[in-house]
Amino acid sequence: MKRTRQMGLRLLGVALCMTALCACAAEAEPTADELFAKRMDNAFDPATIDVIGDRLTDWQVERLDDLTYLRNYRNNIADRRGWVHGAMYVGIFNWAALPGNERHYEPLLKIAEEEKWLLGDRLFHGDDHIVGQMYLSLYNREEEKDGEKIDHTIRQLNTIMAADPQNSLEFAGDGIRGVGRACQIRWCWCDALFMSPQTWIMLTAATGDPQYTEFADKEFWATTEYLQDPETHLYFRDSRYFTQQDEEGNKIFWARGNGWVYAGVANILRILPQDHPSYAKYLQLYKDMSKTIAGLQHGNGFWRVSLLAKEKYESPETSGTGFMTYGLAWGVNEGHLDAETYAPVVRKGWNALVSAVQDDGMLGWVQPIGAAPDSVFETDSQLYGVGAFLLTATQMMRFDD
């Protein structure tokens, strides 16, 4: 009788173990493919965000050697030291910095070495400074610093400081091949505020020389005084748009242009010491822009390519939306923005961005290169759009409102 009872207990134990094993098998972790396929159902799940970010990065990096698939392809898009690539590098570096994502440093380091750690060819042009942000970020990761990797950046910025251009910021005259407009030896267009000042501030951190930050600070506020609309706190792309209006009679504020500025200010706040005399001023600018930007989001979660448009430009657009969502998410994460007010805007923006990710990993609905609101299609992609998306994804990995 006793042996029968013991045998029964053993069988019961085996049965319970088998049941537990079956339950564990039934609850196996979903694969990356499964997470990606259901990305819209679990867009805020960190595991899903991780898969989406990896898919976008891999898709784009695999195609860097041939960009002719892009609508409105131009030869300068292939310039790996230019702003189109540079904006992508900023996003990939932030994504690679997350635990477990270190493999994404490899293509950045390969490009830096192949390009000999050189800035772009145009000495003064802000667009050709953004690649320096990648160089300095990679340099900062080194345990034993190799100063030669940032020598060219130092020499170029020293030359600019010594010249200290004082020209007008008016965007006038014909462009000069290889240089741009005459005014572009300074930051006379709002995009430049994402491309250049961060490189200067990062160089101060790398060298200990405050002159670089002071120069960037001076030029940033000169551009802001010139291009910012005091009523809306938004930026005109350049002086050509001061008096222009759209078909509805609105001032023309380009979404990606303001995205460049807004994300650029967030990036400055991330690297500028909080005891710097201008830190509070940047933070106030950031908060003022946040209030305006949050109020201009549309019901589908996107911002229109022309921010004040009510009827026109109804198509989604992901580069402006990416930079806006990134800036807002960062502010909520850092406690600079009220979560109750801004977290719903961030969530709508992130859902919108995820909806634009195609099944092969391509990000669609990215407005092609331009300087103003324009048409955009689902099949449009661009490297800077991926950069904006990855900046946002990095913040969404720790977004907990």
Predicted features along the sequence, with ranges:
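CBM-like carbohydrate-recognition segments
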Residues: 35-86, 93, 98-105, 114, ...
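Extended ligand-binding groove/face enriched in aromatic
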Residues: 105-109, 117-242, 247-252, 360
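Bacterial N-terminal signal peptides that target proteins for export
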Residues: 2-12
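Acidic/histidine-rich, surface-exposed loop or edge segments in extracytoplasmic proteins
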Residues: 36-37, 198, 269
